[in-house]
Amino acid sequence: GDPVAPSVLLFPPSKEELTTGTATIVCVANKFYPSDITVTWKVDGTTQQSGIENSKTPQSPEDNTYSLSSTLSLTSAQYNSHSVYTCEVVQGSASPIVQSFNRGDC
């Protein structure tokens, strides 16, 4: 089948979670094909290497697409010491799909 680009959503940590000392940021890429996809996390422009967990769903029997959720886990202190959080999703040779948020806007 033809490649299908994902729709990408980025979810900041909840205020409730931050009070517990942890900050979980979730980037979701929905309905893409083929399954070859790369997620890159950046914090204030710096690529993150640790604290990342990816989970991909099996191929959907309805439309043969895949979905992926990528979670970046930080402490509240780490989270509060930075501003811009970015999730970049790259599929094959397509240009990256970028979602980001500014902590101050949340």
UniProtKB/Swiss-Prot annotation:
Entry keyword annotation includes Repeat: no
InterPro entries for the chain: Ig-like_dom, Ig-like_dom_sf, Ig-like_fold, Ig_C1-set, Immune_Resp_Modulators
Bias kind Polar residues: ranges: 48-64
Cysteines engaged in disulfide bonds, as pairs: 27-87
Superkingdom of this protein's organism: Eukaryota
Stretches the record annotates as Disordered: 48-67
Occurrences of domain Ig-like (ranges): 6-99
Database matches in Gene3D superfamilies: Immunoglobulins (2.60.40.10)
Keyword presence, Disulfide bond: yes
Any Pfam family matching the protein: C1-set
TM stretches of this protein: none
Record key words, sorted: Disulfide bond, Immunoglobulin domain
Further comment found in the protein's record: In Basilea rabbits, the major type of light chain is lambda. The kappa chain shown is a minor component. All other rabbit B allotypes have 'Cys-64'. In rabbits two Ig kappa light chain genes are present, C kappa 1 and C kappa 2 or K-BAS.
Designated name of the protein: Ig kappa-b4 chain C region
Name of the encoding gene: K-BAS
